[in-house]
Amino acid sequence: MHGGNKYSSFYLINTISGRPSEKNLYLFNGDIVDKGCRSIECILLLFVYKLVYPFFVYVNRGNHESFQLNVRNGFRDEIIRKYGGENQFDDHFMFEYFGEIFRWMPIAHVINHKILVVHGGISGSTNLAVEDIRNKQ
């Protein structure tokens, strides 16, 4: 899911693919927020998926799960619009909490010990293998 109405896409994924399971793994590859007017609902739904199906749902952090893009592209504004008001500390803390969660999200996953999945990719001019990246951890 990238761009567009992700909230509706969750429904379609469940309808077409079924719920996450041992034989039906889900990998969401970043840019969960800043892509429509329901970013909060999308990321919270994704967190619920991860809690309910911890071994079957994986989430990579994309470049939109960063402070700079959250400010520039509207995620912070969405939080203020939906949760701001008389007590503006609420929206400030909510934005900070999401930022903290985003910083803990992994930037990559390895599938079957040989396929590296990252949101933005790796430069084509490099000759890296998954083992090379693993050795640098």
Name every feature range the model reports, one short phrase each.
Residues 1-137:
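Feature recognizes metal-dependent phosphohydrolase scaffolds
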